[in-house]
Amino acid sequence: MKAAVVGGGIAGVFTAYFLREAGIDVVGFGGELRYPLTSLVLTLSMPDPRDVEMAVESLEIYRKMAAIEPVTSVDIMPTYADLGSLRRAGVKYQILDKFRGLRLARDEIVVVTTDYLIPIRKIVASLRRRLGFSDKRAALGAKGRRVYLVVDGRRVDADAVILAAGADNRELALRIGVDLPFRPYSCYAAAFLVPGWLRGLSIGDYVLSWYGRPGPWPLYIAGDGCGKAYSNPPRGYASKIARLIARRAGWALPLYAKSGVCEGSPTGGPLAGKVGRFDNLYVIGGLDGYGSMVGPAVARRLAELVVKGRAEDLPDLPDAFDFDPCVERHDWSFSLRRS
């Protein structure tokens, strides 16, 4: 059996990795490696038990590949927050009404857990080398019920074609007449100088709506979500986030802002499966900006589906329809709004 993977990020390389582990001949076309030099955060503090389970699984996979650094995680929430998902998943946490220098209101709490810094660029680059990924970009072609790749004008056939190209998934599939249930959006973040006691914390503020992560010294990286696909951060974005940080920590000095492109799904979480119109096309996407947290676990399930024809906890792909890609299942904010 031969498999061809389109996409060289977390979803693509880990799907290829698990296929290779199962004895499948795999070729991969990854394009340019786009991950930042800074580590990405894996958190276990999420409202959906499915995401917590996959994050735990992904963490164990990462630990076999690189040194993982723990970091204190602080989630700021209203006192009525339901932490049942953490209890059911066995995640250790503390509930406090004060923490270091954070400024909290009377009806707010902090939930302290442990996050993990994942050197994702190093891991992905290493897997691309080990698996022989090409830096070339691939397009999809179709004849009857079979899909093939087109690379530099050359046709590449495979028994299984796996589309794992992130925000490019939908555009690539549309070229063969398939509308996938994914939509791209821009995710914004900015770099800051902050008080020393804050810089080492991974923070999710679900009252003021911002998050922050340790960046390369002496930077702190923070943001508040997403906007229209392929758009730059709005004017004054970094200053706006700095004001939110300052309300908690006293001060923050904004330096610059950047945007990236993420991909959402109708469920607000990751999706993977077989595209029913074709006999050999599979897709993994909708990682919604948290591919570093659950990507390897979802990729393992998709590889199992390709090899065995079935997989645990992998629902069928829904039909495509319009939805708000900014609704992220892993974000406590949306759970709290329903409370």
Where do the language-model regions lie?
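Glycine-rich FAD pyrophosphate-binding loop
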Residues: R20-T38
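Short beta-strand to alpha-helix junction loop
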Residues: E53-V56, T79-A81, E108-S126, N232-Y237, ...
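Flavin (FAD/FMN) cofactor-binding core of flavoprotein oxidoreductases
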Residues: S239-S333
